[in-house]
Swiss-Prot record:
Function of the protein: Produces ATP from ADP in the presence of a proton gradient across the membrane. The catalytic sites are hosted primarily by the beta subunits.
Membrane topology: Peripheral membrane protein
Binding site residues for ATP: 155-162
Disulfide bonds: none
GO cellular component entries: plasma membrane; proton-transporting ATP synthase complex
Family, similarity comment: Belongs to the ATPase alpha/beta chains family.
Domain of life: Bacteria
Keywords: ATP synthesis, ATP-binding, Cell membrane, CF(1), Hydrogen ion transport, Ion transport, Membrane, Nucleotide-binding, Translocase, Transport
Gene name tied to this protein: atpD
Subunit details: F-type ATPases have 2 components, CF(1) - the catalytic core - and CF(0) - the membrane proton channel. CF(1) has five subunits: alpha(3), beta(3), gamma(1), delta(1), epsilon(1). CF(0) has three main subunits: a(1), b(2) and c(9-12). The alpha and beta chains form an alternating ring which encloses part of the gamma chain. CF(1) is attached to CF(0) by a central stalk formed by the gamma and epsilon chains, while a peripheral stalk is formed by the delta and b chains.
Protein name: ATP synthase subunit beta
Record's catalysed reaction(s): ATP + H2O + 4 H(+)(in) = ADP + phosphate + 5 H(+)(out)
Subcellular location: Cell membrane
Length: 468
């Protein structure tokens, strides 16, 4: 066994000297196992740099409290490896693939894969495009998701990214019954705990593997936990031919963790203090999330937008990799419209007549045109009032407000907070509902009847109650 000794500790970054002249390879896992009067220590490091002839600089995967210079370190000879396959379903893991739930250890013979690997070769990639129905009206109509695509949920703090992810897990697991992998990257432990219990209660957990490296973990764990989840998803895709859903909450924390260790590793910061390797790190992760001839990975990633600034390098780099974006807007939460998805800023490459069909495409574009015109008229309304508008513009405003409210709906996962039953709306019902609103079929119904409902039949029911 190749052994070395700790020579320097800088928080999560540790230097290790190997005297034998044989340095561990980049990405190799090094371990420390020792006992002293303060208890036992079991640490894993990952090699990041070679310094000179005999020293490596490593990043710790857990807290380095209590570690001292001179401690013996062992080279495992391979990268961090995590359990994969059916044994992972229904379980919760940390970045190293250790089970952290209360269901005991995994069987000793469980198969393990290294977390670092190459993206699939060009000729292995699949090119077919198929829509993934989510049951969420605003998403299915205006920025539909692609099976095997990459989807980003963009938004600032507290606008509902995690709730939207939880609803997608619930809807897709209930309706499509596929396997899901959830990677909690640098987010709140409470949310992870809530999600685990909700999924246990609904039975969805049996088809899900969960991996967590939360806010309180050192940056090494937060940077690598997304790769741990991805490795588990890749096994289901490549070895079992499954269509897998990979949820990452939050991909910004992956970048943030990289920037935390970057300066300690001796790299010169680039724009806004981010690591110079930002685009490379993001590319290495994102290129592995793809569909092959064997199966698909559809990934849904929450992207925190610092200070609501979309030009920040972290969200801007993420944009380049996505097939669809769902933008959450604080202005809509203030109006009580949930999910607070911006219908004009959200995009999808699937919104074309060849993929969604002529009718769906036409209805979606008309909805966007109506909302865009309403947005343009809002300044005039604020200054001069509604009465100064032409009859045609009054009708646009009248319908746009109904459309805006009809884009909202109650979520199953928010039932305990709202007391309202959640709704799942099939795409064809969504398209026909908006088509009828655009045609003026419901111009006589009160605006509030359209708020937080599922299908158009609920609107009619609400209107009857209001008029009674």
């Amino acid at each position: 066994m190749n052994k070395g000794r700790v020579t320097q500790i800088m928080g999560p970054v540790v230097d290790v000297k190997f005297d034998g002249g044989k340095l561990p390879e980049i990405y190799n896992a090094l371990t420390v196992k020792q006992s002293n009067e303060n208890g036992s220590m079991n640490l894993t490091f990952e090699v990041a740099l070679h310094l000179g002839d005999d020293t490596v600089r490593t990043v710790a995967m857990s807290s380095t409290d209590g570690l001292v210079r001179g401690t013996e370190v062992e080279d495992t000879g391979k990268a961090i490896s995590v359990p994969v396959g059916d044994a992972t379903l229904g379980r919760v893991f940390n970045v190293l693939g250790d089970a952290i739930d209360l269901d005991g250890e995994l069987p000793a013979d469980v198969h393990r894969d290294p977390i670092h690997r190459q993206a699939p070769a060009f000729e292995e990639l699949s090119t077919k495009v198929e829509i993934l129905e989510t049951g969420i009206k605003v998403v299915d109509l205006l920025a539909p998701y692609i099976k095997g695509g990459k989807i980003g949920l963009f938004g600032g703090a507290g606008v509902g990214k995690t709730v939207l992810i939880q609803e997608l897990i619930n809807n897709i697991a209930q309706e499509h019954g596929g396997i899901s992998v959830f990677a909690g990257v640098g987010e709140r432990t409470r949310e992870g705990n809530d999600l685990y219990h909700e999924m246990s209660d609904s039975g969805v957990i049996k088809k899900t593997a969960m991996v967590f490296g939360q806010m309180n973990e050192p940056p090494g764990a937060r940077q690598r936990v997304a790769l741990t989840g991805l490795t588990m998803a890749e096994h289901f895709r490549d070895e079992q031919g499954q269509d897998v859903l990979l949820f990452i909450d939050n991909i910004f924390r992956f970048t943030q963790a990289g920037s935390e260790v970057s300066a300690l590793l001796g790299r010169m910061p680039s724009a806004v203090g981010y690591q110079p390797t930002l685009a490379t790190e993001m590319g290495q992760l994102q290129e592995r999330i793809t569909s092959t001839n064997k199966g698909s990975i559809t990934s849904i990633q929450a992207v925190y937008v610092p200070a609501d600034d979309y030009t920040d390098p972290a969200p801007a780099t993420t944009f380049a990799h996505l097939d669809a974006t769902t933008n959450l807007e604080r202005r809509l939460t203030q109006m009580g419209i949930y999910p607070a998805v911006d219908p004009l800023a959200s995009t999808s490459r699937a919104l074309s007549p060849e993929i969604v069909g002529e009718e769906h495409y036409e209805v979606a574009r008309q909805v966007q045109q109506t909302l865009q015109r309403y947005k343009e008229l809002q300044d005039i309304i604020a200054i001069l009032g509604m009465d100064e508008l032409s009859e045609e513009d009054k009708l646009v405003v009248h319908r746009a407000r109904r459309i805006q409210f009809f884009l909202s709906q109650n979520f199953h996962v928010a039932e305990q907070f709202t007391g309202q039953k959640g709704s799942y709306v099939p795409v064809k019902n969504t398209v026909s509902g908006f088509k009828e609103i655009l045609e003026g079929k419901y111009d006589d119904l009160p605006e509030d009847a359209f708020r937080l409902v599922g299908g158009i039949e609920e609107v009619i029911e609400n209107a009857k109650k209001m008029m009674a």
